[in-house]
Amino acid sequence: MAKLIVENQAYTNEDCIHNLINYITTDKETSRVLMVESFGVNPLNKETMISSMIRAKERVNRTNGKQVYHLIISIYRTKNSMSNEQKITYGKNIIYDIGNYFLDHNIQSVLALQSEKECNWDNVHIHCVINSIDMQTGLKITNTASLFKNLLSMLIKEYPFLRMEPYVTYD
């Protein structure tokens, strides 16, 4: 089954945006980044994505408290019959739907599709970093439980073959 996970961390330190975007967009020993997309930020490179999020906060004096949210969408977290190429193709489509979902809610996002080797199969997943403020109002995002539940509902409707777990996991 596919799964939507919200990382339940504070993300309040001043360099968390920089660290998290670098983390999701950098190859590691066991995982590789297949694609990076951004919505509502300058897409030129990692640094412009990071500075776009930070500047949006500075413009409205919202640089304290929770800075970002980190979501992971696992595309069949366990070994299954779907080929790695199919998972990657679905992941690329899902990235655009998620990015546009948050953009429709005036939320900046950076997403990365990754493939991580686990035993003899690939765990294809998407990391999503979203800003904690509304781009139009400058207010902190509230009612994130509803925001994430509606995202999950959209994914379940648009991608029924993924058999998404029907609940958001907070990890």
Across the structure, where does each feature detected by a protein language model lie?
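N-terminal nicking endonuclease/strand-transfer module with a His-rich metal-binding environment
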Residues: 1-171
